[in-house]
């Protein structure tokens, strides 16, 4: 199979779909790889690095899309990229379709085979291709919050970890999954007072065992969210319903109850966000203020540390890329229920139930599509 890697064009997105190291593995398995010129520049990889790994370097994204049977990206295809996709061409990337009907509509009309990293599952019930970026985003969320708590950036002027004789900041983490776990790790490491809210008591037990008494665990209810948000210096939203829009856990009234200069970081913004006041921002303009509260809602947070993120992502995606290329997409999906769960849109049909529900589209089970 010929695999194409275009340069990412989302605002300040410097990750790349495949590293030279991954390219070398793919080529060793008998496949061809074409890479757009300067695609790896943001992670410090030159065109010559890709050539040495066995890839061909093409001048434009159009050349890559035209040549490839499968496109491997990082972020959802932008409008110009969607127009270059061909019927039957495989797209393997993050899609986050639930809150993005425009993208979904164009992918449905285009007829491509669209496999989303974020809904591929594992035998243990995890999301193996979302997890590495959730790890990065959870850690970055605390770093960003600490930065924007500084007075010069609109915050309260609080040092998150405090100093001897002065209280630390209070960090409230909504959701104890991968994002939440890594946010807790960094926040505790910085010396903050940390509270985590989750509706799964087993998750709270796991976190209690992992982090011990410095972490405060709370069963999540509306009352608990209201109470802890109102007294928080930082709230980090890390909730997820795979494929679906994120639930709006924090209302406008809750935001208004926070002290001016507090910071909220919505890591769930890719799936629509879990704060009622959230809307997507970019690394170029990462924040805005509502009711005196600083909102950080960058939709591609890991793109801010592209080298770390790209290598972490490739560690997870490479086996799936090889499976799709070696077996062909149809056989690979038919033989692996977990990879099949990544199929969101195929030849004009919506094949993921949560995505179809969010978009109010007809749902065609992936199994039925593959059997047709």
PLM region spans:
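An N-terminal-biased, well-structured beta-alpha scaffold segment characteristic
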Residues: 2-106, 110
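Glycine-rich phosphate/diphosphate-binding loop of Rossmann-like nucleotide-binding domains
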Residues: 6-45, 152-237, 287
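General beta-strand structural signal in soluble alpha/beta enzymes
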Residues: 5, 34-37, 57-59, 65, ...
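Adenosine-phosphate binding glycine-rich loop
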Residues: 118-159, 269, 274-372
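Short glycine-/small-residue-rich Rossmann-like dinucleotide-binding loops
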Residues: 69, 75-76, 95-96, 221, ...
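Rossmann-like adenosine-cofactor binding region
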Residues: 209-291
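Glycine/serine-rich phosphate-binding loop and adjoining beta1-alpha1 elements at the start
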Residues: 2, 8, 79-170, 298-300
């Amino acid at each position: 199979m010929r695999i194409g890697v275009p340069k990412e064009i989302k605002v300040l997105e410097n990750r790349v779909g495949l590293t030279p190291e991954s390219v070398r593995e793919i080529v060793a398995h008998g496949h061809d790889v074409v890479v757009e010129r300067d695609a790896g520049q943001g992670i410090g990889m030159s065109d010559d690095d890709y050539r040495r790994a066995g890839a061909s370097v093409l001048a434009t994204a159009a050349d890559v899309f035209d040549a490839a049977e499968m496109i491997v990206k990082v972020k959802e295809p932008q409008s110009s990229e969607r127009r270059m996709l061909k019927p039957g061409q495989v797209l393997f990337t993050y899609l986050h379709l639930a809150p993005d009907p425009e993208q979904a509509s164009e992918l449905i009309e285009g007829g491509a085979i669209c496999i989303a990293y974020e809904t591929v599952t594992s035998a243990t019930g995890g999301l193996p291709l979302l997890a590495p970026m959730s790890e990065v985003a959870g850690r970055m969320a605390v770093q960003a919050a600490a930065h924007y708590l500084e007075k010069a950036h609109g915050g309260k002027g609080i040092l998150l970890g405090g100093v001897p004789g002065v209280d630390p900041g209070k960090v409230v983490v909504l959701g104890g999954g991968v994002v939440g776990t890594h946010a807790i790790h960094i926040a505790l490491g910085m010396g903050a007072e940390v509270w985590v809210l989750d509706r799964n008591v087993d998750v709270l037990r796991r976190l209690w065992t992992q982090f011990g008494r410095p972490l405060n665990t709370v069963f999540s209810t509306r009352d608990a969210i209201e109470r802890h948000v109102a007294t928080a210096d930082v709230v980090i939203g890390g909730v997820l319903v795979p494929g679906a829009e994120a639930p709006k856990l924090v209302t406008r009234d809750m935001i208004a109850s926070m002290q001016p200069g507090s910071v909220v970081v919505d890591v769930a913004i890719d799936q629509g966000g879990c704060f009622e006041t959230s809307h997507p921002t970019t690394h170029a303009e990462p924040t805005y203020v509502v009711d005196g509260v600083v909102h950080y809602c960058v939709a591609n947070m890991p793109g801010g540390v592209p080298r770390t993120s790209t290598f972490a992502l490739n560690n997870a995606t490479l086996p799936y890329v090889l499976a799709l290329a070696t077996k062909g997409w149809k056989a690979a999906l038919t033989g692996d229920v977990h990879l099949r769960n990544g199929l969101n849109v195929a030849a004009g049909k919506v094949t993921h139930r949560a995505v179809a529900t969010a978009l109010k589209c007809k749902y065609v089970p992936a199994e039925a599509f593959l059997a047709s």
